[in-house]
């Protein structure tokens, strides 16, 4: 089994939608993909994927579990600890747009828990290259900025794995039942539908 020095995990958190966005008013009020509970996410084979020294970028929204009401941010910290990672810092993506639920705040951000396993060995060229907040307009539900992945490829050595990936990205292997969803020119393997899981090499 191939071991990875970089993991990006964008979990299908057990949430619902808070309403239609003005930027994408044609969206349904229900998510169009299956979600996972915290207990299910804890069972992901992260220890199988991760190398002895490994970096992890774990995406998390500002919402909470629709059943347990536990904030996903708390769940995310529990996940990285259970997977054997140490928290390093919190990164914020300012999407500039988002839903406005029943309250004064429009939810325009998502968070990333940047963590490491083993020894955090940074490339000397990466020192001071990142800020803990970046701004880029959201283009579609759950689609993450290409610049985020490009920076990881530039400053962090591979192999790299994108977990619950939808897009095929240069420099990353992909894992998930919607891998390649947004790639018109890529034919999905039959096993993607059959097993609900697929590992594709970039």
Where are the language model's segments positioned?
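Class I S-adenosyl-L-methionine-dependent methyltransferase catalytic core
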Residues: 1-202
